[in-house]
Amino acid sequence: MKRLLTIIINCSLLIINSSAQEPLSLQRAYDMAQQNYPLIKQRDLIKQTTGYTVDNLSKGFLPQISFSGQATYQSEVTGVKIPIPGISIASVNKDQYKFLTDINQTVYDGGIIKSQKELQSLNAEMEQQKVEVELYKLKERINQLFLGVLFLDEQMKQVDLVKTDLNNGIKRVEAQVDNGVAFKSNLNVLKAELLKADQRIIELESSRKGLIDVLSLFINQNLPENTKLETPQAIAPGIAAEIQRPELKLYSTQQKMLGGQFKLIDSRNKPKAGIFLQGGYGKPGLNLLKNEFAFFYTTGVRLNWSFGGLYTQKNEKKIIEVSQKTVDIQKEVFLLNTNTQLKQQLSELDKLQKLIASDGEIIDLRIKVKDAAKAQLENGVITANDYLREVNAEDQARQSLITHQVQLLQAQINYQTISGKQ
């Protein structure tokens, strides 16, 4: 019994916790959508690839060891034909054997490995930034879903107000019908309109559920139908917004990477130095006059400087300069388009603020007209249709206000998103 009581208490607490769920904020929706977007997995893959590549490049300074062997038969060999008294020089066999081990150690590579490692790091940064650009685009989708739900919530509140007015009208007309001063058809008109309002609620709830379901997919969390969304704080945009979009960092990284390619070209055309050791076993050895198997080795310093790259160095750098100019053009186009969008949003904000101010005045007037119609309905001066017309007129005025308020909030959020501050 005690155990059963504990289970019941825990279940009750679970129900209370679920019902007291905190409203979902727009920023939290952003974060959850980005964390659960499949593309986010590419971040770790880029890090792993970069780590492996840089590690491989670092091994370029490790000793390079190779083994080789050969057995040959020559049609002719070097021999000493001049007779020397008291000395007999044997001829070298035509079949010869050689097994070699070569060890090469790079001492100076002109900075190639360093440049390649820097390039690889910049390439990883560029790929990561491409991911950030794609993730940022998610915000536009989340904005649409989030504000769509808020818009539907406001519409449902307005329908509830209409239902209140209709119920008040129904009570008055019912009293009139009971007293024989109104026709029942007037009552039926209001009841039919009340049923239409209930249908409107069903439509709005269904649309809201659809948006919540899609939002659940994006954030990878099962949101209940009655999930509350926190209305974002309206932020007035500045006169000159500083653009902080991830695309700008991408362009900057691309320029750094092209600059790294300049360094790599210079490094490839510098001299290289290293030490080497070659050891072997063969017949003959280094002493060609000794016709037998022997161990031998050779060691020393090697300097290599190839001038072939100097022929193409100038054109290779010009190609990079063209690429840098292309990136600059892409950046200019992006900034132009972004600033154009910001100007459009500012114009939209100004228009909506004026419309909202006008909506308030219209609603005040419509309320006065509706209240007067309510009194006239109660006194039997007008019919239910006349009263219903004024109720619908106020409803339309409030719907316009709701639409403009949500559009204003959307324009403010869009402004922040476009500028990169959201």
Question: Model segments located where?
Answer:
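Bacterial Sec-pathway N-terminal export signals of envelope proteins
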Residues: 20-66, 181-183, 219-261, 270, ...
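Amphipathic alpha-helical coiled-coil segments
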Residues: 42-57, 134, 138-157, 175, ...
